[in-house]
Amino acid sequence: PAATGIAGSYARFGLHDQFLYTVDNFMLRTWSLQNPTCPSRRDSLYVGWNIETIFPWKDRLFVGSQTGVFIFNNTNPARPVQEAVFNHATGCDPVVCDENNAYVTIHGGTNCNGTFNQLDVIDIKNLPNASLSKSYPMTKPMGLSVTNEHLFLCDDGLKIFDKSDPLNMVQLSHLKNMTTYDVIAFSDEHLMVIGDGGFYQFDVSNP
């Protein structure tokens, strides 16, 4: 199977197979890396306004904007095709996903002009009919990452949830004495967090 790169939820670029995907405020661009020293642009798609993040997952690209999540099918990695759109309340919104759900944080108090602070769980099992399953109120959620068992969330520090039942997630831990922005879970045991003080690594084998 094609390899997908690992990146944070605030990333504006992502890797899949031999292609690089980048987003700016309006566009999704596809670059061939067959010659890694000289990437060549293969495709450009207008997505919408205020595009912020991109998260590759298997044969799909999840693009976050201030008003929603755009889902692209990249079965043909050189030519992604929009498959679904999920609209949400205005706010800054990184997005990650697993096999059945996308997880989106929305936070206000920034230049995104939002007032909501929540974690949305979006059912993506039946695309293109993505639908909101549940919203969890939060303080000011930012970056997030998921593994098979856990959801890691930058919100008033770092929160760790058991997500085995996404509609009834259980908070397992809350580390408050740090300012965090994004998180990357390499496994259910190894975590990297980006915050005011730089990069932090955690052993979360016992969350």
Residue positions per predicted region:
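Feature marking well-ordered beta-strand scaffolds used for ligand recognition
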Residues: 1-207
